[in-house]
Each structure stands twice: as structure tokens, then as C-alpha cells.
Amino acid sequence: LHFWLPSTYANAPGPVAALFAIMSKVGIYAIIRFFTLIFPPDSITGTVATDLILPAALITLTLGQLGVLGTASLTRLAAFAAIASIGTLAISIARFDVPGLTAGLYYMIHSTLISAALFLVVDLIAARRGGDIWLRPRPPIRDIGLVSALFFATAIAMVGLPPLSGFLGKLMILNATAGDGWRV
């Protein structure tokens, strides 16, 4: 996930990358359904979700955020942001209780829509600029105001700044993970 997915997203057209971002969240929903049916929390295998998903979620979140900081391509930036949102979502799923799953489902809706929107906006920028490498000087874009406002709005929504829904979703995840001795 951490190595092949950013390249796949970066080389796909914007609408295809947006669809891929949606499909990766469908995989997370499948994990929720699988673990709630096969490994209920009150059974002997109830800790399997936490033991398996939490370390993978923390690694995914860390590598996604490091990728966001280290890339020069806008499409790879959007890809790593989508990976980091999968890690954040998986942390709430690893909680494997009602507050954690509720927070995860709320955040899943937010991150699915914002990830898809970010890929579409980045594709719009790349099409108008002639490339997605933001460090390389390019000619200025006409009507940059609307495009930059769209990028700014989707970027801060992806980060989860208030008053947008990503902030509420991440706050719900933090509240869900604060109980039972979990260190936030």
C-alpha cells in the first residue's frame, strides 16, 4: 500500500485516481464488516482487530504523512494524503467498539469525499499548468483564484482544520481512542 499506491494514483488520470480513492475506502468498510461478523469483541478472538490493525494503522499513518512532507508532485501529495487518511481511519477501527466504529464511519464519509475532490482539483491544476511538479517554475495559470481556492479548501479539509468536517471526524477518533488506557 505504501509503495505502489502513490505511483498508481500519480500516473492515473484525475477521475480514475478519485475513483481509486473511493475504492480504497470500500476496502476499509469491508474490514469493518469482516471483523464485526467474524471476530466479535466479546469472543476469545476479540483482540485480533486491535492486535493486527493498530500497528498497521500507525505505520500507514506515519508513512502517509512522511510522504506528504517529502514529495514534490501534487498528485503524489494527494496520494499520500489519502494513505494517511486510511491510517487515521484504521486507528478508529482498531478500537473495535461503538465509539471507535462510529467515529470511523463518520470520518470515512468525510475522507472519501475529500480525497476524491483533492484528486480532481490536483488534476485540474496539472492540466492548466502542464504538469504537477509544484517546485518547477511554470507559466502562471489564468483564473488562478478559483482553482487556488478549491485547492486550499480541499487541502485544509483533508488536514482536518476547524470548522470543517474533517476536524470533527478526527476529534471523534481522538475521543474514542482516549479510553481504556490507550495513549493518544
Question: What label would you give each PLM region?
Answer:
Residues 1-52, 79:
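Short helix-boundary/re-entrant hairpin motifs in multi-pass inner-membrane proteins
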Residues 13, 26, 49-96:
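Internal transmembrane alpha-helices of multipass membrane proteins
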Residues 2, 19-20, 66-83, 102-109:
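Hydrophobic alpha-helical membrane segments of integral membrane proteins
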Residues 44-60, 106-113:
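Structural signature of hydrophobic alpha-helical transmembrane segments
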Residues 3-21, 79-85, 115-116, 121-183:
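Interfacial and helix-entry/exit segments of alpha-helical transmembrane bundles
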Residues 32-36, 64-65, 89-93, 118-123, ...:
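Structural signal for membrane-spanning alpha-helices in multi-pass inner-membrane proteins
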Residues 32-49, 89-106, 176-184:
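Helix-coil boundary and interhelical linker segments in multi-pass alpha-helical membrane proteins
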Residues 24, 36, 59-60, 84-87, ...:
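Transmembrane alpha-helical core residues of multi-pass small-molecule transporters
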